[in-house]
């Protein structure tokens, strides 16, 4: 049995989207159970529409809901211990749930997750990983916004975290990993990226196939299973891709409605356009995963519909079922056992920074 905690108040639509999504997933996954947190007067009416959902879920009233415009510090100060978001994360820490899903404020969710779950022993900072549609299927891209700027050690952490996710979600025994750079040549790029590349080449990990540097267009091509970058570049790449997808969709709609012949052509090509729309739909790959924490937290898009939120739940379900955390911890232990200098140099950097 896999138990998923749900922040029912998160996102633009709250329980009106969240509760139908739970019913969808419960139908597909008979071994799933839900622990739902939210405001009773808003959640109960939605739950009443799906009587069978009561058989596989528990509901707990929370008076406070974190707003989408709350600053992380405000959300942590006012929502700790009593908000639906905090309770959903706390359920993972206590063992009441195996994973947490929320469509709420990203900054607040990350702040609460870090405060409540803490990072893994050898991880400096967590990362947000996204599933990215590609010509070959999907890739894991991280970090897409948690850490602005990252040193070589943190990029290696991200590579190991992303590898664990790819193994859990894609079922690939040895995922290919690439470092996002301004060129594929080893002499190009920032020193942190070049140093991370050197260390990954020398690591020779059984669970990871280091490909080398990749460029921006390699993400969509699906050149590698895991693309590693720091959060500033990753977030810009993600938002650019989402905007480009919407732009292309707009172009197609305009072109297909311009003339009578275009409209007739659309009727005959509708199935092809539907497949294209499905491939470009962000909702199909909905869910940013907070990696590097002592627990699984999935952030759904705030504007996701019920199908999109269901996709985020199923992503969390798959990672629990495929032992994501155990895989990551084993990979981290193996890397540091083979590269003890990496951890010692990191500790010395921390000491130096403290002295400065």
Curated annotation (Swiss-Prot):
Pathway it works in: Lipid metabolism; phospholipid metabolism
Known catalytic reactions: a fatty acyl-[ACP] + phosphate = an acyl phosphate + holo-[ACP]
GO molecular function, one term: phosphate:acyl-[acyl carrier protein] acyltransferase activity
Principal EC category: transferase
Entry EC number(s): 2.3.1.274
Single GO biological process annotation from the record: fatty acid biosynthetic process
Keyword flag Cytoplasm: yes
Major place of residence: cytoplasm
Family: Belongs to the PlsX family.
Name of the protein described by the UniProt record: Phosphate acyltransferase
Species name: Mesorhizobium japonicum (strain LMG 29417 / CECT 9101 / MAFF 303099)
Record lineage: Bacteria, Pseudomonadati, Pseudomonadota, Alphaproteobacteria, Hyphomicrobiales
């Amino acid at each position: 049995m896999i138990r998923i905690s749900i922040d029912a108040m998160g996102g633009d639509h709250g329980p009106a989207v969240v509760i139908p999504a739970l019913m969808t997933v419960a139908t597909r996954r008979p071994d799933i159970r839900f622990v739902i947190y939210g405001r009773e007067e808003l959640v109960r009416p939605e739950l009443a529409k799906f009587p069978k959902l009561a058989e596989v879920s528990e509901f707990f009233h929370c008076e406070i809901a974190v707003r989408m415009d709350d600053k992380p510090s405000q959300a942590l100060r006012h929502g700790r211990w009593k908000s639906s978001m905090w309770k959903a994360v706390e359920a993972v820490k206590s063992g009441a749930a195996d994973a947490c899903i929320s469509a709420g404020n990203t900054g607040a969710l990350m702040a609460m997750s870090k405060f409540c779950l803490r990072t893994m022993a050898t991880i400096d900072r967590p990362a947000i990983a996204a599933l990215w549609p590609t010509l070959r299927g999907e890739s894991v891209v991280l970090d897409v916004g948690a850490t602005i700027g990252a040193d070589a050690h943190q990029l290696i952490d991200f590579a190991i975290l992303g590898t664990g996710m790819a193994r859990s979600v894609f079922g690939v025994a040895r995922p290919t990993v690439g470092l996002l750079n301004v060129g594929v040549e080893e002499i190009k790029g920032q020193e942190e990226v070049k140093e991370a590349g050197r260390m990954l080449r020398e690591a020779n990990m059984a669970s990871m196939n280091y490909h080398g540097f990749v460029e921006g267009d390699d993400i969509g091509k699906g050149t590698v299973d895991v693309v590693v970058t720091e959060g500033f570049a990753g977030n810009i790449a993600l938002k650019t891709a989402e905007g480009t997808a919407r732009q292309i969709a707009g172009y197609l709609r305009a072109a297909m409605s311009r003339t009578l012949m275009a409209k007739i052509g659309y009727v005959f090509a509708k199935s092809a356009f539907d497949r294209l729309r499905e491939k470009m739909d962000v909702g199909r790959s909905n869910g940013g995963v907070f990696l590097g924490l002592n627990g699984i937290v999935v952030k759904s898009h705030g504007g996701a519909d019920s199908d999109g939120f269901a996709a985020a739940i199923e992503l969390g379900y798959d990672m629990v079922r495929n032992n994501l955390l155990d895989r990551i911890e084993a990979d981290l232990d193996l890397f540091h056992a083979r590269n003890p200098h990496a951890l010692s140099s990191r500790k010395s950097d921390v000491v130096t920074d403290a002295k400065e």
